[in-house]
Curated annotation (Swiss-Prot):
It comes from Kocuria rhizophila (strain ATCC 9341 / DSM 348 / NBRC 103217 / DC2201). This is Lipoyl synthase. It catalyses: [[Fe-S] cluster scaffold protein carrying a second [4Fe-4S](2+) cluster] + N(6)-octanoyl-L-lysyl-[protein] + 2 oxidized [2Fe-2S]-[ferredoxin] + 2 S-adenosyl-L-methionine + 4 H(+) = [[Fe-S] cluster scaffold protein] + N(6)-[(R)-dihydrolipoyl]-L-lysyl-[protein] + 4 Fe(3+) + 2 hydrogen sulfide + 2 5'-deoxyadenosine + 2 L-methionine + 2 reduced [2Fe-2S]-[ferredoxin]. Its main location: cytoplasm. It is an enzyme of class 2 (transferase).
């Protein structure tokens, strides 16, 4: 394989990746869809009004559960990223012009879908002086203004570590301030060549220093060891991270990083317990967990553990019960 599906010549790393066949998934990664009335209503609304969510467009396997709980994720800044991470299937290249009306459009989508909690994530926009910080901040403000009873979680790139850019997002006061570390120091540059491990930790620390509830994610199965995961968890907690999600890497296609291992549900349970012992206030770990999975539930859990009262206008966001994709729930189903 020397040509990418879109017709361009493969990068050397892509050609090397393509030499490794796509891996067969283990039995525990099979997902059973359960469509409830809330999901059916949201799906009908989204189709009827031409609304776009990452949940549908990325084919997320957890869409049924999240939509049933009136939670969804939106991607802003366009569909092209200025950086290439070896696990991510978002297109890399020169992005188009910023749509200054996008914050309003996203806020209207949140309103039309009747969401209780919205996660907003952004492509990296290194072509912009502020890295897209204004767009992220304005989207938070627009959602809150139009949907006062909706919680907002913002998942940002690192804005090249520019404190002023990060501060713009913090000042918009999202319920959760998130930046994903994704992997461990030893393989970080191989997996995320345009990012820096310490810089990512610094972004999280800035959020914590300004009173944010801070969240991050680690993807397992890209070449790390369990000991390295534990060390990264300690680094994240030391940086001020309150909430952590642990996920299994699923290879999007042959030109992406090969899967190094399938992490068993039992290992996710052990790592989840380790994260709680380290001091994380909210932990979600499992093979099919994704960073925005049951995000509102994790926020509510962290708020209660911090001793913060959940505001009246967000009191409908609950942290009770288990989540289907948590490793412990998965093991219970597997028997």
């Amino acid at each position: 394989m020397t040509i990418a599906p879109e017709g361009r010549k493969l990068l050397r790393v892509e050609a090397r990746n393509a030499e490794v066949p796509i891996e067969k998934k283990p039995s525990w990664l099979k997902n059973t869809a359960k469509m409830g009335p809330q999901f059916t209503e949201l799906k009908s609304m989204a189709r009827g009004r031409g609304l776009h969510t990452v949940c549908e467009e990325a084919g997320c396997p957890n869409i049924y559960e999240c939509w049933e709980d009136r939670e969804a994720t939106f991607l802003i800044g366009g569909d092209t990223c200025t950086r290439r991470c070896d696990f991510c299937d978002i297109a890399t290249g020169k992005p188009g012009m910023v749509d200054v009306a996008e914050p309003r459009k996203v806020a209207e989508s949140v309103r039309d879908l009747g969401l209780r909690y919205a996660t907003v994530t952004s492509v990296a926009r290194d072509d912009l002086a502020d890295g897209g910080a204004w767009l992220n901040a304005e989207t938070i403000r627009a959602i809150h203004a139009m949907n006062p009873s909706t919680g907002v979680e913002i998942l940002i790139p690192d804005f090249k570590g520019q404190p002023d850019a990060v501060q713009q997002v913090i000042d918009a006061q999202p319920e959760v301030f998130a930046h994903n570390l994704e992997t461990v120091p030893r393989i970080f540059k191989q997996i995320r060549p345009a990012f820096a491990y310490e810089r990512s930790l610094d972004v999280l620390t800035q959020g914590k220093e300004h009173g944010m509830i801070v969240k991050s994610n680690l993807i397992l199965g890209m070449g790390e060891t369990d000991d390295e995961v534990y060390e990264a968890l300690c680094d994240l907690h030391d940086a001020g991270c309150d909430i952590i999600t642990l996920t299994q890497y699923l290879r999007p296609g042959p030109t992406f990083h090969p899967i190094d291992r399938w992490v068993k549900p039992e290992t996710f349970v052990e790592l989840s317990k380790a994260a709680e012992e380290i001091g994380f206030l909210g932990v979600m770990a499992g093979p099919m967990v994704r960073s925005s999975y049951r995000a509102g539930k994790l926020w509510a859990r962290a708020m209660k553990k911090m001793g913060r009262e959940i505001p009246e206008h967000l009191s409908h966001i609950d942290d009770s019960g288990s989540a289907t994709q948590e490793a412990s729930s998965l093991l219970a189903r597997l028997g």
